């Protein structure tokens, strides 16, 4: 969203709909807009916005809480540390539809059966949120995002009815469940996010918490009833219209299970690595693969530790995957290549090997005990971890061939 559009949108917002709102809101219509997923990782969860139409002036304004700028100074650093800055922006309906048509994303709108006074309140609150001192917030993918901001705004307008209807009612899944099914189109991103998520991601969600997903806000709003002027319960949604239907970037209804294919990858790594015990050049390919595994898993473990202790990402804390992708593996690499010292394994080697082996065991027990839903990471990492450890141990204990006796 350009700075020019933001300035123009702000001026228009504070002028036309606010004037109609102050006139009682009779001329206003309020819509929940739900955008389908896109191709990029930050588009995979979908999006939503609130559209206010002023039937007197013909002005259509779309309020979007998901605005950010990659080029903003410090954005990448704040994103990495879990403190990205997003803001509320406003644009025209025409610009919004052209943007989503360009990115081949669906757009569905639901007109809300709000009394005139509530529509006026909604327009005024959105205009107030757009003020420079109010429009910026610290974004969290699961707890405070474009969708939860829309959810919370609607709940305030509805006098808490949305929260009352959904809080405590079991949802469809967990943060991990919804994340897996949303990003399954990108194998590398899928595996990375799956590894990075800790046990917080496995806590069951109620319908209120599940509305971090725009599609869930759409569903709950569709189901909700409110009292009309006569005190009768009527659907909150007057009508639902599809403004754009492309259907290119679908999200799976259930999460995939990659355990089988990841187990095969782990077995392949292990089979090649075990040949590293061969003497001479015959063992070099196996030791090379074992080294690559220890480097990859060790660096991954360091990243997990950073996400756990060094950032504000709630979903990455207390992550048992660190036990399976252990940084100690980086220190095992010299054992794959050096000749055994005459005195045998040193105390450091024993301590290092023991720590690494215990770590793998802890990771195995954690998965079996249900401490964290990381079966796919276990399938990938456990057997290669054990095999590379055994190969390093065998090579370290193997006697050095005796030199030929000079004649």
Which functions belong to the PLM regions below?
Residues 21-251:
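Soluble extramembrane regions of membrane proteins in the secretory/endomembrane system
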Residues 16-18:
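N-terminal signal peptide c-region/cleavage motif recognized by signal peptidases
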Residues 1-2, 21:
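Initiator methionine at the very start of the polypeptide chain
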Residues 2-11:
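Sec-dependent signal peptide recognition
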Residues 224-314, 324:
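Core alpha-helical transmembrane segments of integral membrane proteins
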Residues 295-407:
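Generic detector of multi-pass transmembrane helix bundles and their immediately adjacent loops
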Residues 91-94, 115, 174, 255-264, ...:
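General structural signal for secondary-structure boundaries
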